Structures are given as C-alpha cells and as structure tokens.
Amino acid sequence: IYLRHDLALKPKLAYAWKGVTGESENAYGKIVITKEFQPDQEIVLPAGETLVVDFGQNAAAVPSFVFSAKAGTKLTCLPSELLNDGNGAKERGMDGPEGSCHRTNLRMQDTGMILDYTFADNKGYASFTPHNTFFGYRFISVTATDEVKIKQLESIPVTSITKEMETGTIT
C-alpha cells in the first residue's frame, strides 16, 4: 500500500460548530456553525467546538495534519462517509444533528476508525500522517481538549499503484 501525496485531496468545505438547535424527541436537531474556513486558511479550533471537513469525494485515505497545540492536548479525528441530514431525524437512521458526521453505518462506530493524537512539548508546528492504517471517508470530525491550530490539512489517498506504475490517463 502506498500513500499517494501527489493525489492529495484538499478540503472543499470546513466549519466549526458548537451547540444544536431544533432538537426534539424524534430528531437530533441541527448544528450551530460558529465559523467557516476558506481553503488553505489556518484553522483555529477552540476546545469544546467540533471541526467538520469535507474533502469532496470518498476515498481510501489517511488525514494528514500540520498543526500545533499545547503539550498534552489530545486531538480526536473521526472519519465518516456522510453527514447527518434532515434535522437529524431518528426515523431516518441519523445518529446526530444535521451537519455532523454520521457514523452509524460503520461496523465499529464507537471503537473503530478513530484517530487519536496527543501533542508533545514541541516548539512550532508538528506534522502527522498515519502510516499503519487507512480509512474510507469523505468527511472528518475533529475535536480537541485544548485549542489547536491547523496550518495544513489534507486527505492522502492510499493505493497499490505507485505513480511510476501508471501507464495512462483518463481525461
């Protein structure tokens, strides 16, 4: 399996949210977006907020971060293939408020497909790209125990074909 950095997907949409409106007995409601981020903009994620990132297409890939935070800060990244919609209607199988990452369709939604990172005592930004796992996802949901600054975020596809093995192109 090869990480194809040359095929890296950049975020198409990214927003932070905190809180929910319109929840009821039959629906989780809708997220309250606190900030939307432009492509290539540094993302500052405060503790207590959730970042949702849309990479624009589903892929077998790993998220790749260039980020910084205080030592001991724990970041959790949850990949998902779709977002909750329809006001988070429980009868439609939604597992959270509209706009949040949907994970009920995963075999091990609570214990699998989870990426945790704990920041060490370093100066400046750290780079992290997992090399011993991969996920199938289009979206990621990111939370942290303290403020995190994300300078760069990409989704790096995995494949069994290196760039050098390619023999043609599709146009």
Task: Report residues per predicted region.
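Extracellular/oxidizing-compartment recognition motifs
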Residues: I1-T171
